């Protein structure tokens, strides 16, 4: 297990390859977040990584019986990530929060999915001129970066390499096709796909029962 990497002046902690059960990452991750971390019973952290750029007010919670293989990044002060119970976050997935990302219960997220609640940089060049330098120091100014919470409802399923952008709410039971770019809200129990993602059709009653 590798403790704080200073290269990016953030705080990072890797879970060991092969996975670990409740308790193995919990103490270290809680220390990085100054106690604001909880991991539910039976949750498996499998080669996951937590990066905390600035720990002030940041928090992370993961429910019970989930499997986490993703990288989770808390970019700014007060950033929050909430992951429910019985969720799967696949390898190569990045959950990148500068505001708040909330993932409900029974959510399936395939590999290499990107979920972001921010634009990363300001559109105005003068306001992003020193972003890289300050980001490496953990002192990046997020004041002029657009941030809006992301919420993924219970029972949703996100296909491989989907991208979910800031301010999006994905409704309960919805299915996001592989490679889709989700830029606006998705109604509950809806199949969407494409770039940008568009409604393909509502899920049938039979499909809803299977979810």
Predicted regions and their residues:
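Conserved coupling/switch loop of ABC ATPases
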Residues: 166, 184
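A generic "structured core" feature
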Residues: 175, 180-181
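Domain-scale signature associated with acetyltransferase and cell-envelope carbohydrate enzymes
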Residues: 1-123, 134, 143-155, 162, ...
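Conserved loop-to-helix junction within protein kinase catalytic domains, corresponding to the end
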Residues: 125-127
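Adaptor protein-protein interaction modules in ubiquitin signaling
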Residues: 131, 138-139
């Amino acid at each position: 297990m590798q403790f704080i990497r200073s290269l990016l002046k953030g705080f990072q902690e890797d879970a060991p390859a092969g996975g670990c059960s409740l308790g193995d990452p919990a103490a270290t991750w809680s220390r990085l977040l100054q106690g604001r971390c909880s991991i539910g019973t039976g949750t498996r952290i499998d080669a996951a990584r937590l990066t905390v750029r600035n720990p002030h007010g940041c928090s992370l919670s993961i429910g019970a019986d989930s499997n986490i293989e993703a990288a989770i990044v808390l970019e700014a002060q007060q950033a929050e990530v909430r992951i429910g119970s019985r969720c799967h976050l696949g390898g190569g997935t990045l959950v990148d929060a500068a505001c708040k990302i909330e993932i409900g219960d029974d959510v399936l997220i395939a590999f290499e999915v990107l979920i972001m609640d921010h634009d990363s940089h300001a559109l105005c060049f003068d306001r992003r001129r020193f972003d890289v330098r300050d980001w490496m120091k953990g002192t990046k100014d997020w004041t002029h970066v657009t941030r809006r919470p992301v919420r993924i409802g219970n029972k949703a399923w996100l296909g491989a390499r989907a991208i979910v952008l800031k301010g999006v709410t994905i409704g309960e039971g919805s299915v996001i096709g592989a490679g889709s770019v989700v830029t606006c809200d998705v109604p509950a129990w809806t199949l969407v796909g494409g770039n940008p993602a568009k409604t393909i059709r509502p899920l049938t009653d039979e499909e809803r029962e299977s979810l």
